[in-house]
Amino acid sequence: SPVFVAELKEALANLKKIVFCERGESFIVAGAGSLAMEMALLNAIAKRERVLVLSQGFFGQRMQKIAQSFGLNCDILQSDEGKAVEPELLGDRISQKAYTAVVATHVDTATGVSAPVGEYARIIQEKEAFFIVDGVCATGGIEERMDDWGVDIILTAAQKCFGVPPGLAVLVVSERVIKKRERMKRIPAFYSDLLNWLPIMKDPSKYFSTPCVNEIRAFLEGTKIMLEEGMENRFVRHTRVAQTIRAELLELGFSFVPENPYLADTLSVVRYPDGVEDGIFRKTYAENGVIVAGGLGDFAGKVFRMGHMGNLSFSQVYFALEALKKTLASIGYFGKLKSDVHTTESKFDAVKNKRAKEK
């Protein structure tokens, strides 16, 4: 319908504003973040060309697997646990070997490590390589300035910082990459080929594949909320929320997988103190109104992952923290901290009642 055509056009334009891009093309297609990862690699790097993946965890390793599945010549720089790849190591590597592209996960959802992608970009700009940023857990919550930094692709998904349901693979692509894709002629993809999608992104009234109308409408609303708040304000709020949550968790005896300079403002990957069992904790926390994810890979059973991104208000943060204290009390952990359980439960009930009235 003409209404949906206008909505998709607006969503595409808003997406570019969110990543501070004026020179490039935005793409919103049915799929998940992993599809966006595939699309980024397939359209920027030809078979047997060399790509360097900067990894600080599970999703950097996934990017390596995707690259290898397409026959790309892939090297990986793996950070130490709790850290990102140091910019100096990146500089040394790309001075020794030529790469078509460098890929970095901005925030690894499995480890909670945030990488200094702005610093990476300055180093990569000295070379001819493309810079691809996996922003699935960062875009819209942590600063990403595509044009100013010289980033060639920012890929992301709908369900994280945009605060809408999953189902969309989202990319913003530089003119350099579009021209490279045109020179490559054929690639081993059809649905993932940006050249098949480009005419639709320029004129959504055309057909290539059925769009997921409801998800795109939700995504548009998400972008409007973000731009109404203002991106600079949004970045500051994410930082303040993260600081509030981390301070409380530290006081309660928890610790984090990332070291201090690498803590992400969009989620925390939290190590359990002695005496707290993963399954019981997460089940009880859910019963108290807050769902957190378990650990991935080697961290399974050892950590929980708490997202604090999107349109999170401070009343929601306080509710989650009071629910956390109530959870710890009910599983018998508060005796070790010598905290006042009755005060905690009263505060929890007060926050819960306030939220009920707001609804």
Feature-to-residue mapping (PLM):
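Conserved PLP-binding catalytic core of the aspartate aminotransferase-like
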Residues: 255-287
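PLP-dependent enzyme catalytic core of the Aspartate aminotransferase-like
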Residues: 298, 302-359
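Active-site phosphate-binding strand-loop segment of PLP-dependent enzymes
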Residues: 85-140, 153
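Conserved active-site segment immediately N-terminal to the catalytic lysine
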Residues: 147-159
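A glycine-/small-polar-enriched, mobile loop at the entrance of the PLP active site in fold-type I
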Residues: 1-28, 34
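Active-site C-terminal subdomain of aminotransferase-like
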Residues: 159-247, 251
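Conserved beta-loop-alpha segment that forms the PLP phosphate-binding cup at the N-terminus of a helix
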Residues: 24-52, 56, 60-64
